[in-house]
C-alpha cells in the first residue's frame, strides 16, 4: 500500500510539470479536500505556489458552512483561499448546469498556470450520459478530458 504523503510529482501530466502556480477548486467535498491535501504535499516539495478557490453558490442551506469549512481547512494547510459568492439563475438546462457555468466563470479568473478540479468516476459517467441524452457527437461523448485549456494562460486539470 502506498502512503498518500508520497504523492509523486509524476502524477502531474507532462504538460503540467513546469507549472509554478496551481490553484485547486475546493468545494469542501471529499474529492476536492483529498486533492488539495495531496497537492499541498507536492507543492512543498516542488516549490509550487498553491492556492485554492471556493465558489459559494448559495444553493444549499449548508453553503455558508461549506465556505467556513474551506476557510478553516485552507488555514490548517497554510494555503491561500480565493472565494466568490455567485448568483445562480436556472436556465433551460437546469440549476446544476447554471451552477457549473457560474463556477467555471470564477475558475476562469484564476492567475494560476493550472486549475486542478477533483472528480470521481460517477462524474465522468454523468457527463457522458448527459452528452448522450443531448445527442452529443464524438467529442461530447468523450466526457471530461484530463487536461484542457481553461483560459489563455491556464490549463484545467482533472486528475
Language-model segments: residues:
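Core alpha/beta nucleotide-donor-binding catalytic domains of modification enzymes
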Residues: 1-159
